[in-house]
A protein has these predicted regions:
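An amphipathic, aromatic/His-enriched active-site/gating alpha helix that lines ligand/cofactor pockets
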Residues: 2-3, 22-43, 51, 63-104
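Basic/polar N-terminal segments that are highly enriched at the extreme N-terminus
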Residues: 1-5, 114-115
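Mature N-terminal segment immediately following signal peptide/propeptide cleavage
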Residues: 18
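Acidic/histidine-enriched, glycine/proline-rich intrinsically disordered or flexible terminal extensions
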Residues: 97, 106-115
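Accessory recognition modules or surfaces
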Residues: 3-8, 12-14, 47-48, 53-66
Length: 115
């Protein structure tokens, strides 16, 4: 549900060379469930169609009740022992992500309402 304080977080992950498949698998098998556990609502996930981004980029949007909730959600996610274990195991052969970009967004008054 969208409220006046609802924020959307656009996140762009730039995978380490050759690691996009492993990053997508981590999201598919673990990360989405952990996001839900920590109050982060997944809106959608994309991979670019064209190079050079096609081979190393994951883009997604999360919904949070507020900026404050987003900060608390990320803290609880990062402190979660299950996430720490998944993260460590998934990076046993090297880090999966080179760079993460995060931008918080607010819906405009003329935007179609999102779920």
């Amino acid at each position: 549900m969208h409220t006046a304080t609802t924020v959307y977080e656009l996140r762009v992950y730039h995978a380490a060379p050759g690691k996009l498949g492993e990053l997508l698998a981590r999201f598919r098998e673990h990360t989405l469930k952990l996001f839900e556990k920590h109050g982060m609502k997944s809106v959608a996930y994309w991979t670019p169609v064209d190079e050079p981004e096609k081979s190393d980029t994951l883009i997604y949007i999360l919904q949070h009740p507020s900026r404050e909730a987003a900060a608390a959600n990320w803290k609880s996610f990062q402190d979660d022992p299950e996430w720490k274990s998944v993260h460590e195991k998934s990076e046993a052969n090297g880090k999966l992500v080179d760079k993460i970009e995060s931008t918080f967004l607010a819906l405009t008054d003329f935007s179609p309402r999102l779920p």
